[in-house]
Regions:
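Alpha-helical transmembrane segments, especially those used as permease/efflux helices
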Residues: 1-28, 32, 214-215, 233, ...
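Membrane transport/envelope proteins' first extracytoplasmic loop
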Residues: 2-273, 285-288, 344, 520-529, ...
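Alpha-helical transmembrane segments of multi-pass membrane proteins
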Residues: 16-24, 266, 305, 309-322, ...
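Interfacial "coupling" helices/loops that link adjacent transmembrane helices in transporter permeases
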Residues: 22, 277-319, 396, 738-780
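Alpha-helical transmembrane segments
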Residues: 26, 37-65, 261, 284, ...
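Juxtamembrane segments of multi-pass membrane proteins
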Residues: 63-79, 442, 448-606, 611-614, ...
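Small-residue-rich transmembrane alpha-helices
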Residues: 280-283, 316-348, 360-386, 415-429, ...
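C-terminal transmembrane helical bundles of large multi-pass transporters
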Residues: 489, 493, 675-680, 691-812, ...
């Protein structure tokens, strides 16, 4: 205790007192850290709120259940056979209850508007998961209100909020008019408040919900509640072997959101890097002014380890202050991102989101700030320790000698870039998981920072030599300034280059992807109408029921009609999309292009073989003619690979790992549901003239001719990629503000130098020219490095091939002209 007390006393007198005495510089340093923390918190809020609706499938749904709940999730998404559920009931002796559910997030048209709901079907045993709401008594004693279709139930508070009365029709996209209505309401809103923000529709049974969601005979998942003290893991695993997996309840994220969260992680990391670099720059200036004092303290007997620890403590204090300052602005920034972009990213998904302030944000902000502050202080503190007290005492007045950037940042930076290139070249073929690609981008950004640190001062000297020919006095002063503050200049350039590269890369991907995807239908299916229950890149599994298809076929009036069927083999970020088509018809040939002989490929699909996208084949390690084992609704089966295909149009799931099969095989082995219908017309004008025939069916359909596809696809891809672009520019803005902070600190720091320069005849105009020249050279260097790092970085493409994105999970390729060559790049993960 005595040692701790002595250490605290020393820290308070030497370090805290210095921070308080120089409060202006301390505040500016903390503001710099707060800018980085603001970016981190804003992105983390967006990320957490985007995934919150998908907690409805697991964590939110089981909030009232006892500890030990096991969720059984099928290998084929949303397709847990009822036979498996029955076996769980019969063969898991230690289970108190087995609760199957059928659920989906879906937009619902209610009271003249559209809102996202969590459609949930199950027995009254659901009360064991969410808490009691008198389900059995209400089902027994209260008759549902009369209305069209099946009766559904929702919280009374939600019905009142939207002015929805009992008996009114509830329309779900993909179902014909008159399919469902509001039959009951219940007042126990607190039971479902955490599930999709309370926007829940309860179906009377799993069978009814399955019919609404085109999955009869299957449950979405099942929850097994163990008896007290019972261990059910082994029995559950035995029953579900080959069909499903078991574990604690977890969110069911769309595959594209797995990739989005990884990208948001990258932006959050960029915010941390910005915060560290901001703190490094501001703390460098603050420490330089106190080096002589600290050297004197060391010379009169202070232990070097104690001084080093005290300096790190100073960094932690400045970081803590900056982190706390960044919490309110971070929450406001996160709320803005959520309102501006989060809702558009979830449009059509059925998810409902809102910003939630939690005490955890304070802890995260404080922790991020402390990390920034400590990392920023390590360099100056280590140098103070390395130089010793005498050298530090001789540094009164600031930096006394030219600084040199060592060679190691260049060597390490180039090494990191080389590693990123190799990893992303492998990743681009699809054989590595998505998180490896994101980690590769992170490594590349770190490489950009280190290379910039080495290049910036040397590049500045070349530009200064040119300036010296025109303005000798200004050039010499500027050269001396850069040499003395080389590290500060290098870190400032690295800060701006890293943030600007992120912004340029994100914007390039958005612009290129938007233009190319908007023209896909006109190029592949110009004379057809595409009919779907969801918009382009809506994050849900849209479906067209059999009764809706009959309406569509009738409206087609004898024209050629073809369907696409879809299911998903679930494995998180590496989910595999199963697509069923009529092999070799006009629609399938427009969507998928075999790499080998087309006739042989389509014949193979007719005979029960499968096709794989290049990414799927790479991940499975197979080629044409090989046999591969794949999960099905009944367990693993073997299939012969008929060939490799290239997808030609973006799919709504934005997944490039695709298995192509005949319609019959997709329905029997993977329980695929119809998700899109194409109707052929003699011309594009004729197709446009018949759009209203399908819109008037009242089934909530999206009907695409060329112009509608161009408009909706542009909005879809923009709303999905724009948040990353804006976040990149926000990081860049934070970096720019931090440099303004550094310039202000620098002017305060060098007041003695400016007085000395005035004494030897330097005019105020020359001094101003030096400041402008410093900023101009910094801007010119950063512009060059950022363009190379943005257009050529893995954020918009592989580092070695500037036009090819590393996010190679979508099989759809767009093209970007580089010189005279066209390079493919895939749109999104």
């Amino acid at each position: 205790m005595r040692a701790l007390r002595a250490g605290w006393l020393s820290f308070r007198r030497l370090h805290l007192a210095a921070l308080i005495d120089d409060w202006r510089r301390t505040l500016l340093s903390a503001i710099g850290v707060a800018l980085g923390v603001t970016v981190v918190l804003g992105v983390l809020i967006l990320k957490s709120e985007l995934v919150r609706p998908f907690d409805a499938f697991g964590p939110s749904l089981t909030h009232a259940a006892d500890i030990g709940v096991v969720e059984v999730t099928p290998n084929i998404s949303g397709r847990l056979p009822t036979e498996t559920v029955n076996r769980l009931h019969a063969e898991v002796a230690g289970a108190e209850a087995v609760i199957p559910i059928v659920a989906a997030l879906t937009p619902v048209d209610v009271a003249g508007g559209s809102h996202g709901f969590f459609l949930l079907g199950g027995s009254c045993q659901i009360e064991l998961l969410v808490g009691s709401f008198n389900c059995e008594q209400r089902a027994r004693d209260v008759q549902p209100a009369a209305g069209p279709g099946v009766p559904l139930q929702m919280p009374e508070a939600i019905a009142q909020r939207h002015g929805l009365r009992l008996g009114e029709e509830v329309r779900i996209p993909g179902l014909p008019p008159g399919s469902a209505h509001l039959g009951w309401t219940f007042p126990e809103f607190d039971r479902v408040e955490g599930i999709n923000d309370g926007y829940v529709l309860l179906a009377p049974s799993t069978d009814i919900a399955a019919s609404l969601l085109s999955s009869p005979g299957y449950a979405t998942s099942a929850f097994v509640l163990p008896k007290p003290g019972a261990d059910i893991a082994a029995d559950v695993d035995r029953v579900i072997a080959g069909v499903a997996t078991a574990g604690p309840p977890r969110p069911h994220l769309p595959a594209v959101f797995e990739g989005a969260t990884q990208s948001l992680n990258l932006i959050a990391l960029a915010g941390i890097i910005v915060g560290v670099l901001i703190a490094v720059n501001t703390i460098l200036l603050a420490v330089e002014d106190r080096r002589a004092v600290m050297g004197t303290i060391g010379a009169i007997g202070a232990k070097p380890v104690g001084l080093f620890g005290g300096m790190l403590g100073e960094g932690a204090v400045v970081g803590l202050l900056g982190g706390l300052l960044g919490v309110p602005s971070g929450f406001l920034f996160g709320t803005y991102l959520l309102d501006r972009f989060g809702r558009s990213m979830l449009a059509g998904s059925g998810g409902t989101i809102a910003a939630h302030f939690t005490p955890n944000l304070i802890g995260i902000g404080a922790a991020a700030g402390i990390v920034c502050g400590i990392i920023a202080m390590v360099g100056p503190a280590a140098r103070l320790l390395r130089d010793g007290p005498l050298a530090s005492m001789a540094s009164v007045g600031g930096v006394q000698r030219a600084r040199k950037i060592p060679m190691w940042p260049l060597v390490v930076g180039v090494g990191l870039l080389a590693v990123a290139v190799v990893v992303l070249k492998i990743f681009e073929r699809g054989s590595l998981p998505l998180n490896v690609g994101i980690n590769g981008l992170t490594v590349a950004l770190c490489g950009v920072v280190l290379v910039t640190v080495w290049i910036a001062p040397r590049g500045a000297r070349l530009l200064i030599e040119l300036l010296t020919f025109a303005r000798p006095a200004v050039g010499r002063l500027l050269g001396a300034d850069i040499r003395r503050y080389a590290l500060l200049f290098a870190m400032s350039a690295a800060l701006l280059a890293e943030s600007t590269s992120l912004a340029i890369g994100s914007h390039a991907m958005q612009l290129l992807g938007t233009v190319q995807i908007a023209e896909q239908k006109a190029e592949r299916l110009p004379d057809a109408l595409l009919i779907s229950a969801q918009s382009v890149l809506d994050q849900r599994d849209g479906r067209l029921s059999d009764s809706t298809f009959e309406l569509v076929a009738g409206a087609a009036d004898g024209r050629s009609v073809s369907s696409r069927w879809r299911s998903t083999i679930s494995s998180g970020a590496s989910s595999r999309l199963v697509v069923g088509v009529t092999p070799g018809d006009w629609y399938s040939q427009a969507l998928y292009e075999p790499t080998d002989v087309p006739d042989g490929f389509w014949q193979g699909l007719r005979e029960g073989e499968i096709g794989l996208s290049e990414i799927a084949a790479s991940r499975l390690g197979v080629s044409t003619g090989d046999t591969v084992t794949l999960p099905t609704v009944e367990g693993p089966k073997q299939y012969r690979v008929a060939g490799i295909v290239r997808p030609q149009m973006v799919n709504d799931a934005a997944v490039g790992d695709i298995l192509l099969a005949s319609e019959g095989l997709a329905r029997s082995d993977w329980a695929a549901a119809r998700d899109q219908v194409a109707v052929a017309y003699p011309s594009a004008a004729d197709a446009t003239a018949h759009r209203d025939d399908f819109l008037d069916l009242g089934a909530g359909l999206w009907v695409y001719d060329n112009q509608e596809w161009r408009s909706v696809a542009t909005n879809g891809i923009t709303r999905f990629l724009e948040p990353f672009t804006i976040a990149g520019y926000v990081v860049m803005l934070a970096a720019g503000l931090s440099l303004l902070n550094v310039f202000v600190l620098g002017l305060v720091q060098r007041k003695r130098e400016r007085a000395a320069l005035r004494a030897i005849g330097v005019t105020s105009g020359q001094e101003q020219a030096v400041i402008v020249g410093n900023a101009g050279i910094l801007g010119a260097l950063v512009a060059c490095l950022a363009v190379l790092g943005g257009v050529g970085s893995p954020t918009s493409g592989r580092w070695a091939h500037p036009c090819t994105t590393a996010s190679r999970s979508n099989g759809v390729c767009c093209r970007f002209r580089c010189g005279q060559r066209w390079q493919p790049y895939s749109l999104s993960s």
